[in-house]
Each structure stands twice: as structure tokens, then as C-alpha cells.
């Protein structure tokens, strides 16, 4: 199994999304699959120009000469595609959206011979509420539920409160955090073995680490301290 992961976080491995993405990919490797990871921060990929030349002028070929020329064949051959992104303004990051838009050459109308893929979403946000991910889930479900799609959406690892997770790690309160990280690793193994991620494991990755009011109180105190340090 070949897995292609695209991390859309501008902070790459220092970002909150990597807290879940990296152990998830470790689990995939441990189960025997091959993983290739790219960061949009390191790629030069412009937005789709919408001229449809990849359909009608040069079918299957994008006319823009940038890093998408290297990514497109990898997307085409992957057994599993992992989209990873923090929540930015109720959506994925702009660079990742550009990359996703640029897949147009791979979805030629009437092309029934395309390889079928499984798709996973990994996302993080600083808020407590799991509902913050609803717009991203709506996009994934819309993309991969179309009757002519060659892809299947097989699970989402959604992690709210990621800033809180980092603070808990700094304070040495790693028990609950370790459980979340282990669940992400288990999700990787399960994906390879069973072809999808169970609802049970998805819930373990997303579970609350503290009550809502306590979380936002701690978050406000952290923001106040950050402001004072800048004065």
C-alpha cells in the first residue's frame, strides 16, 4: 500500500496538526505500508487558472509548470491520500486548497479507468468544540460522495484543543495526551489492515481533555501572558 500525505500547515512539523498526523503515519508504516509526506510550505503550487486546458486542449496535463507536475503522478498512483490541515477561517489552509483544486487533470469526465483511492482527513484546531470541523467534513463528504468519484472517504482524525495539548505536555500532564497520540497511531495501523478507520478510534482521537469552561479560562490566561510579553 502506498500512502501519500500532504500537510498543509505553514508550521509543518512544529504545527498542531503534526501532533496527530505524525503518529498516524507512524502507525501506517508499522503496519507495512509505504508513506510519502509533503508539506505545502515547501512546494511551489499556484492556484488553478480555470482555463480547462487539462480537459480539452491537453487532456490529463496541467499547463502550469510548477511543483504540481511532480505531485500529480503521486496522487494518481497513491492507494491512500491523507489531507492534513489546521482549521483556518472554517476551512483548510489556502495552499492546500490550491493543491486540491489542481487535481482537475486527474478527474477527466468519463474516465472510468482511474485508480481508486481511499481518503483520510487529519485536522486540528485550537477551539474546544468539535463542531469547528463541520465545514471541513462537509467538503470531504461532498467531494467523495459524488457518483462518478474514484475515491472513498474512510475516516477523519479531528483534534480540537491542540494548544491545550501542548501546554499539558509542557506541564508534564501527559496521560490523556498519550492516549490521544496512541489512538492516532492505532488509526494508522487499522487503516492499513482494514481499509478504514473505525468510529471508536476517531472518537478517541477527538475526546475532550478538560471541561469547556476550564479550557477557555486557561486559554485566556495564556493569551494575556502572551500580550504582556510583547509589551
Where are these regions (language model features)?
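Short, glycine-/small-residue-rich phosphate/pyrophosphate-handling segment
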Residues: 95, 109-156
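Short, surface-exposed loop/turn motifs that are enriched in glycine and acidic residues
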Residues: 86-89, 126-130, 174
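Short aromatic-enriched loop/helix-cap "lid" or pocket-rim segments at secondary-structure transitions
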Residues: 48-50, 133-134, 167-170
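Short beta-strand elements in bilobed, periplasmic/extracellular small-molecule ligand-binding domains
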Residues: 34-38, 150-159
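A conserved mid-domain beta-alpha-beta active-site/ligand-binding segment of alpha/beta enzyme cores
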Residues: 154-167, 174-188, 193
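Glycine-rich beta-alpha junction loops
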Residues: 44, 126, 159-163
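A short small-residue
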Residues: 2-5, 121, 161-171
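N-terminal beta1-alpha1-beta2 submodule of the flavodoxin-like/Rossmannoid cofactor-binding fold
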Residues: 1-106, 178-231
Amino acid at each position: 500500500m502506498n500512502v501519500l500525505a500532504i500537510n498543509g500547515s505553514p508550521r509543518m512539523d512544529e504545527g498542531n496538526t503534526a501532533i496527530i498526523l505524525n503518529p498516524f503515519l507512524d502507525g501506517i508504516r508499522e503496519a507495512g505500508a509505504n508513506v510519502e509526506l509533503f508539506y505545502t510550505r515547501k512546494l511551489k503550487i499556484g492556484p488553478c487558472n480555470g482555463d480547462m486546458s487539462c480537459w480539452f486542449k491537453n487532456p490529463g496535463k496541467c499547463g502550469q509548470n510548477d511543483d504540481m507536475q511532480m505531485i500529480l503522478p503521486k496522487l494518481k498512483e497513491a492507494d491512500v491520500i491523507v489531507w492534513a490541515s489546521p482549521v483556518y477561517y472554517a476551512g483548510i489552509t489556502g495552499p492546500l486548497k490550491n493543491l486540491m483544486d489542481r487535481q482537475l487533470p486527474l478527474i477527466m469526465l468519463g474516465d472510468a479507468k482511474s485508480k481508486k483511492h481511499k481518503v483520510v482527513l487529519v485536522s486540528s484546531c485550537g477551539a474546544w468544540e468539535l463542531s469547528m470541523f463541520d465545514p471541513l467534513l462537509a467538503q470531504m463528504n461532498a467531494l467523495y460522495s459524488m457518483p462518478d468519484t474514484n475515491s472513498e472517504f474512510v475516516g477523519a482524525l479531528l483534534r480540537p484543543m491542540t494548544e491545550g495539548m501542548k501546554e499539558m505536555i509542557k506541564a508534564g500532564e501527559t496521560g490523556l495526551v498519550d492516549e490521544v497520540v496512541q489512538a492516532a497511531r492505532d488509526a494508522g495501523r487499522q487503516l492499513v489492515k482494514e481499509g478504514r478507520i473505525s468510529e471508536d478510534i476517531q472518537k478517541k482521537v477527538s475526546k475532550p481533555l478538560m471541561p469547556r469552561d476550564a479550557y477557555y479560562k486557561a486559554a485566556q490566561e495564556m493569551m494575556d501572558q502572551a500580550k504582556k510579553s510583547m509589551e
